[in-house]
């Protein structure tokens, strides 16, 4: 079978926020084709791979991606044509070398990732394998706990509600992914009713979660617990809570600005707040509890809570093995958030997950707030057996597409599928 790359074609499409992004088609000599599209974040880490934008204010307010598209259709195509799509690492490393920068700013992380994912899809198609099996082999059968972001704050809610960006539920007590998805959907709809009864807006944010104008951060947790109970489930044993404050967004001059509560706190005071919540509420996961470069604060946070809950670094690590290695050495967390577009290739994404595993850390795959209907992260999650992922609320097509892909994968696996459940998190 001829799995050499014959053609690569990129185009500018729109993401879920109506902003341009890159879609790539890779065609092999055997006729197999793979298509992938690239997401975009709202709260981005300062150390992420560069998303190449045109900065032409006459088009899409400067957010066009025609330069990235052109880079795929010329330079990248010329370099990769004739290469074997099955040689994923070789292809990814060639693109990194071709770019020549540390942050993929010349060709664009969005251009490179689109090609990287489309190559994997084309190779899987040529071999007549589902993507998760192509990436993970026969043993890939662990279904993840879905972390549903059902209540939004921070930048995802235009700072109209809680300071903390995401309040999630994790149905760890379910027996399968299919059951977990149902539980999540039921709680989501109960939360809508709870908010309506309390006189709050039920408009949804970028990731499908509700964005009510709450006065206190803890109100979000109280409302979610009420919704869990109203849906007929037990907080803690059946459904746990996860929080992503995205703290870099409210960190300034060494202090954390809790706008909704009208106060500024230092790292230790914020850690004390988290500790009191972990005592009071069934919280299993805290992501980006402190700012991306507050390394000393993260050490204190891990000392306080690292043996009780999963502490995930997102902006702190940006899926970058050098930063993850520093985190492991300095003992600042116990898990890594994995976003392929933060680093820019499938090979580097897998390396980040493997590094986390090597340190007995957890890895949680994640979407971005500006998504597409590409479901590659669902296949990646099962392929790598990460046991949990977050891809928004059970609402909005670009979020639901990932959840529906897990249903297909679980069905495909049949009796071999097993649900991560309570073992999903490091604690």
Curated annotation (Swiss-Prot):
Origin species, per record, is: Pseudomonas syringae pv. syringae (strain B728a)
Entry's Gene Ontology BP terms: glycolytic process
Return the cofactor note field.
Binds a second Mg(2+) ion via substrate during catalysis.
Output this protein's name: Enolase 2
Q: Which cofactor does it need?
A: Mg(2+)
Keywords attached to this Swiss-Prot or TrEMBL record, sorted alphabetically, are: Cytoplasm, Glycolysis, Lyase, Magnesium, Metal-binding, Secreted
The task this protein performs is described as: Catalyzes the reversible conversion of 2-phosphoglycerate (2-PG) into phosphoenolpyruvate (PEP). It is essential for the degradation of carbohydrates via glycolysis.
Broad class of where this protein is predominantly found: cytoplasm
Q: In which pathway does it act?
A: Carbohydrate degradation; glycolysis; pyruvate from D-glyceraldehyde 3-phosphate: step 4/5
One of the record's GO molecular function terms: magnesium ion binding
The cellular location(s) given in this protein's UniProt record come to: Cytoplasm; Secreted; Cell surface
């Amino acid at each position: 079978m001829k799995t050499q790359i014959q053609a690569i074609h990129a185009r500018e499409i729109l993401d879920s926020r109506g902003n341009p992004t890159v879609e790539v088609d890779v065609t092999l000599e055997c006729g197999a084709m793979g298509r992938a599209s690239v997401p975009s974040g709202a709260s981005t880490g300062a150390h992420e791979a560069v998303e190449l934008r045109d900065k032409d204010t006459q088009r899409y307010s400067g957010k066009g991606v025609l330069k990235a598209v052109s880079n795929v259709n010329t330079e990248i195509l010329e370099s990769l044509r004739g290469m074997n799509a099955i040689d994923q690492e070789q292809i990814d490393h060639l693109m990194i070398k071709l770019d020549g920068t540390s942050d993929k700013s010349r060709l664009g992380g969005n251009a490179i990732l689109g090609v990287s994912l489309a190559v994997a899809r084309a190779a899987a198609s040529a071999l007549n394998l589902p993507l998760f099996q192509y990436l993970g082999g026969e043993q890939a059968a662990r279904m993840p706990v879905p972390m549903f972001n059902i209540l939004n704050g921070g930048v995802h809610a235009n700072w109209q509600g809680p300071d903390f960006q995401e309040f999630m539920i994790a149905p760890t007590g379910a027996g399968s992914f299919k059951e977990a998805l149902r539980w999540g959907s039921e709680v989501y709809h109960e939360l809508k009713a709870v908010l309506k009864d309390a006189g709050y807006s039920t408009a949804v944010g970028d990731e499908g979660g509700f964005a009510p104008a709450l006065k206190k951060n803890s109100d979000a947790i109280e409302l979610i617990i009420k919704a869990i109970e109203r849906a007929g489930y037990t907080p803690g044993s059946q459904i746990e809570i996860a929080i992503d404050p995205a703290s870099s967004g409210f960190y300034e001059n060494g202090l954390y600005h809790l706008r909704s509560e009208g106060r500024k706190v230092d790292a230790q005071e914020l850690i004390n707040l988290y500790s009191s919540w972990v005592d009071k509420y069934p919280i299993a996961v805290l992501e980006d509890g402190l700012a991306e470069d507050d390394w000393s604060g993260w050490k204190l946070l891990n000392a306080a809570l690292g043996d009780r809950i999963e502490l995930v670094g997102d902006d702190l690590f940006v899926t970058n093995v050098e930063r993850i290695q520093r985190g492991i050495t300095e003992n600042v967390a116990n898990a890594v958030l994995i976003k392929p577009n933060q680093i820019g290739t499938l090979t580097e994404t897998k390396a980040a997950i493997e590094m986390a595993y090597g340190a007995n850390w957890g890895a949680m795959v994640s979407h971005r707030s500006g998504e597409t209907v590409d479901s590659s992260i669902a296949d990646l999650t099962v392929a790598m057996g990460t046991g949990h992922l977050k891809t928004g609320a059970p609402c909005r097509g670009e979020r639901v597409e990932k959840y529906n892909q897990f249903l297909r994968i679980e069905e495909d696996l049949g009796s071999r599928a097993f649900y991560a459940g309570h073992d999903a998190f490091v604690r």
